[in-house]
Amino acid sequence: MLQGVHNWTSNNIYVLNQKVVVDSEATLNIEAGTIIKGTAGQGSLASALVIARGGMINANGTENAPIIFTSVSDNIEIGQSSGTNLGPNDQGLWGGVLILGNAPCSFSGDVSELQIEGIPADDTFGLYGGNNPNDNSGSFTYVSIRHGGAVIGADNEINGLTLGGVGDNTIINNVEVVANSDDGIEFFGGTVNANNLLIWASGDDGIDIDQAYSGTISNSVVILGDNSDHALEIDGPEGSLFDSFILNNITLIGNEITENGEYADYRSNAMGSTNNIYALSLIHI
């Protein structure tokens, strides 16, 4: 559990050998070009970086010096932008990144908070949701998340980037997720906007929207891999809170061999608008 202010710098490689949690009222600053590696593990032993409600992350890479989250199996070294030994089918080698906030979500039974998917129920830092649409969890820009998605239970893996109840004062842009065994990025409610996303070769869905997420996702690309499911999976509200998302300028690319690869799965009264969606090379539309 990180408390106070912590600074991770690009002259080190940081290793997550368990769930590292940025506690409420704590701040983690990550310098451009920093590499963070997660160890293998399943269930309660899965490694992940979790920003708890009330915590802050300022992870701001640059175009030439992105912040990289990857596996300890990746041979990438300080100063490099990629390793040479892992490919798009090397998935589930560590956990992922979870950012949790106090923004509204539509939960079954109209409860005010819920335990986030990907964190075991007995870990109290996994709660998300609230009543502040303008909540601020920091900024997460020019970040690459690779080879994650550790299994924590039956049909329960960690997404590359999980955003649970994140508010619209949080900045999310220029984020890529590569070779995650579950979804690339999943939005559980909240109001945060995101742009310039790239999801490649996820084992499940590219972008997943749930629980009346009401932000805007724009200028983004999903590229399906050999094991991918839907490019988009969008579910509606679970409680009485009804709100709607916006998707603007999204490109969806199939690989023409993924039998289950589909453009989108809209379910459970999904509510939102999609504008300028370009889809190609998908077996099922």
Where are these regions (language model features)?
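Beta-strand/loop edge motif enriched in small/polar residues
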Residues: 1-282
